[in-house]
Curated annotation (Swiss-Prot):
Keywords associated with the record: ATP-binding, Disulfide bond, Glycoprotein, Kinase, Membrane, Nucleotide-binding, Phosphoprotein, Serine/threonine-protein kinase, Signal, Transferase, Transmembrane, Transmembrane helix
Positions annotated to bind ATP: 460-468, 482
Catalytic activity: L-seryl-[protein] + ATP = O-phospho-L-seryl-[protein] + ADP + H(+); L-threonyl-[protein] + ATP = O-phospho-L-threonyl-[protein] + ADP + H(+)
Domain comment (free text): The EGF-like region is specific to this family of proteins and seems to consist of the C-terminal of an EGF-like domain fused to the N-terminal of another one.
Species, as recorded: Arabidopsis thaliana
Glycan-modified residues: 78, 114, 121, 164, 233, 238, 259, 283, 365
GO cellular component, one term: membrane
Membrane-spanning parts: 380-400
Protein name in UniProt: Putative wall-associated receptor kinase-like 13
Presence of the UniProt keyword Cell cycle in the record: no
Modified residues annotated as Phosphothreonine in this record: 613, 618
SUPFAM superfamilies: Protein kinase-like (PK-like) (SSF56112)
One Pfam family hit: PK_Tyr_Ser-Thr
Length: 764
């Protein structure tokens, strides 16, 4: 155990000694090129690991030495750290860059042997392509393209035409941003990094390589590590030259018509390509020894406490990092304590602005920055006085504008209140005080506060007529606030009358109208809030809940039929719902049904229709007789309720697609056909089929069949429907009924049980 501790201690001392060795005995320069750590020349310890080892080799022609990276077999042109003035890789502020000499792809040249393609592969290395590189092609009849950049296509075409005014266009130079960024590099990219996807521009468009002898296209960005270059012969028919030397290469240098005329020159001269690099090492102790602050902490708003920052990431035991000196410091972040404070007061010209005596500022250098102090007291006082004056004048203007805006808003609310019939509503509320004392006229401010200014997060329903928001009143009550999209001004009188009528409805299975607001452009209705969704959701969506029981569905049918019977007959004046459907039947926390969205729909509808002239309703629920005559009656509500009964029995939606023929049909027609063919048991919802009271289901099906008769006169009214459902619900378990077939379809009656059991079915 002691031996292991000694080993770890010696290893730590060794890793901490690496930067010291770099300063004391290592060479920092090869020729005219600086070699900053983690790169290094010489013995182990002068560089981080083999990826960063640099050899200083002599040139075979000039005799001068040049730096060389043996691990990737490339000559080094320049190495820069982030934040330095010579950092050409400026679009990666968190990455360092290195420029290396790159080979070229060629065809038809004296030295290539028809090598028409090359591949630059930096996978599994700490190097990747920078975004300053372009694809350049030189030579006649030359079509060059990049490979391994899918799905991006990058290429251009260089031709030599008969006329200097005729220039070819790159055959696909629309460069997209590559999405092939490896996960390690993506984690190290700065969060504010925006890749550059446009092609390279030169101020003088007449000099750019635009296809006449040479062409260029922007290489994709995104930290790619594998790119290939290929050359093919162009098939352009307007050529005077087709042979000769052709070259193509990836480079960060700018080539124009003046310096890219001879393809052969690129073999001797060479080209440079820009690469980004980061730290890739298994030596986690080295990263810890830098004592840099994690850049993620700064992104979260944490105060800077170190002289350097790093983006760190560990994957598969390998440590990855990209470091930089913090703002206000300069140096090498990969050498411990090498980031030194910049004295802005001496290194920058006029860091505090104007240096005239009257406005003299004193610069004081601070760690990572500087401060400017104005010692000219009179000007300070003058500035404070002017500031107070501007503040007072600005405050007065703000208060005056606020007063005008408030007065304008008050006048607007008063106008809306009068136009929306508020005076008439107040008068009628006063005359019926005893019956509608709970109805309230809400102010727009109350409802804005209750719904958080009608915040989209409060939306609980949205449809053609308007949007419903969940709100909370100051007394703690949860309410549903219905804000219509448009109002028909010709029907405002009718709307007010409906509010009076609905305010007098007091039925436990009808959603209570609590009041309205008339101070807005369109009237807003306020209902009690029902928290458990609607029947449609529980029947047709993934709800594994209480409604899967037949007894619960039977109770819902009894409750809502009683509510509609009350609206048709027991209310002070008949109210026809006109849009009965499962989405308008709400369930509270105890699965008690409540009817919503009745009566007022014709007053606040966005389609401006009169209920006796234009068809309105929901597909699958509309009475076919009403559809043909445009005349709505109480029996039209009965038909829609019959569709809801079929939904409760079958669990199907009002419009279905037949599995055999893929034909779209209404649930009512599908149900009538199944009853004619004595297939009721087959279409019963599988969730209730095994534990339901079959005689009750048959009785309800017979009742639904009567409700769905095509002529309104032959349908029962809602009072009969409600009474029949209550009798079915309370009948003994062993009662028997017959399956009753629609006589209009001229089919034979099928029976279940004995003939004496028809009394209940006929009474329905």
């Amino acid at each position: 155990m002691r031996g292991n501790k000694n080993y770890y201690f010696l290893s730590l001392l060794y890793f901490l000694s690496l930067p010291i060795l770099h300063f004391s005995s290592c060479t920092h320069k090869c020729g005219d090129i600086q070699i900053p750590f983690p790169f290094g020349i010489g013995e182990i310890g002068c560089y981080l690991d083999e990826w960063y080892q640099v050899e200083c080799r002599p040139s075979a022609t000039s005799g001068k030495v040049f730096p060389f990276l043996p691990k990737i077999n490339m000559e080094v042109v320049n190495i820069s750290l982030p934040g330095t003035n010579d950092d050409i890789f400026y679009t990666y502020p968190s990455f360092s860059s290195i420029r290396v000499k790159s080979p070229v792809a060629s065809m038809g040249c004296s030295t290539d042997g028809n090598d028409s393609g090359l591949t630059l592969n930096f996978t599994e290395t700490p190097f990747f392509f920078g975004d300053q590189n372009n694809l350049v092609a030189v030579g006649c009849n030359n079509k060059a393209s990049l490979t391994n950049v899918e799905p991006t296509m990058v290429g251009c075409e260089s031709t030599c035409t008969t006329s200097n005014n005729s220039r070819s266009i790159p055959f696909f130079n629309k460069v997209g941003c590559s999405g092939s960024v490896d996960s390690v590099t993506r984690d190290l990219l700065p969060k504010n990094y925006i890749p550059v996807c446009s092609t390279t521009k030169i101020q003088d468009d007449t000099l750019i390589c635009n296809g006449e002898g040479c062409c260029q296209a922007k290489a994709p960005v995104g930290s790619q590590q594998l790119i290939g270059v290929t050359i093919t012969n162009s098939t352009n028919g307007n050529l005077t030259k087709g042979g000769g030397c052709k070259v193509a290469f990836l480079t960060d240098e700018v080539y124009t018509l003046s310096n890219a005329t001879d393809p052969e020159q690129f073999f001797s001269k060479g080209v440079t390509v820009s690469l980004g690099w980061f730290i890739q090492t298994k030596n986690h102790s080295f990263l810890q020894s830098l004592d840099c602050q994690n850049r993620g902490e700064l992104d979260k708003g944490k105060k800077r406490t170190r002289q350097c920052t790093c983006d760190n990431h560990i994957a598969s035991g390998m440590g990855y990092a990209s470091c930089a000196c913090a703002s206000g410091y300069k140096g090498n972040p990969y050498v411990s304590d090498d980031c030194q404070d910049i004295n802005e007061c001496t290194e920058y010209k006029n860091p505090c602005g104007d240096t005239r005596i009257l406005y003299r500022n004193t610069c004081i250098n601070t760690s990572g920055g500087h401060r400017c102090i104005d010692y000219h007291i009179p000007e300070v006082m003058l500035g404070l006085g002017a500031g107070f004056f501007v503040l007072i004048v600005g405050g007065g203007i703000w208060w005056w504008r606020k007063l005008l805006r408030k007065r304008r808003m008050t006048n607007r609310k008063r106008k809306f209140f009068k136009r929306n019939g508020g005076l008439l509503l107040q008068q009628q509320l006063n005359t019926t005080q005893g019956r509608v004392e709970k109805t309230k006229l809400f102010s727009s401010r109350e409802l804005e506060k209750a719904t958080d200014n009608f915040n989209d997060n409060r939306v609980i329903g949205q449809g053609g007529q308007g949007t419903v928001y969940k709100g909370m009143l100051v007394d703690g009550r949860s309410v549903a606030v219905k804000k219509s999209n448009v109002v028909d001004e010709d029907k405002l009188q009718e709307f007010i009358n409906e509010v009076i009528i609905l305010s007098q409805i007091n039925h436990r299975h009808v959603v209570k109208l609590l009041g309205c607001c008339l101070e807005t452009e369109v009237p807003i209705l306020v209902y009690e809030f029902i928290p458990n969704g609607n029947l449609f959701q529980h029947l047709h969506e993934e709800f594994d809940d209480y409604t899967a029981l037949w007894g619960v569905r039977m109770r819902i049918a009894v409750d809502i039929s009683g509510a509609f019977s009350y609206l048709h007959t027991a209310a002070c004046s008949p109210i026809y719902h006109r849009d009965i459907k499962s989405t308008n039947i709400l369930l509270d926390e105890k699965y008690r049904a409540k009817v919503s969205d009745f009566g007022t729909s014709r007053s606040v509808s966005i389609d401006h229709t009169h209920w006796t002239t234009v068809i309105s309703g929901t597909v699958g629920y509309v009475d076919p007789e009403y559809y043909g005559s445009s005349h709505f009656t109480e029996k039209s509500d009965v038909y829609s309720f019959g569709v809801v009964l079929v939904e409760l029995i079958t669990g199907e939606k009002p419009v279905i697609t037949l599995s055999e023929t893929q034909e779209i049909t209404g649930l009512a027609d599908y149900f009538r056909l199944a009853m004619r063919e004595n297939r009721l048991f087959e279409i019963i919802d599988a969730r209730i089929r095994n534990d339901c009271k079959l005689e009750q289901v048959i009785a309800v099906a017979n009742l639904a069949l009567r409700c769905l008769k095509k002529t309104g006169k032959t349908r029962p009214d809602m009072r009969e429907v409600s009474t029949a459902l209550e009798r079915i619900c309370s009948a003994p378990e062993d009662f028997q009924v017959q399956i009753q077939i629609d006589e209009e379809d001229e089919t034979t009656k099928l029976f279940r049980g004995y003939s004496g059991s028809t009394e209940i079915a006929r009474s329905m």
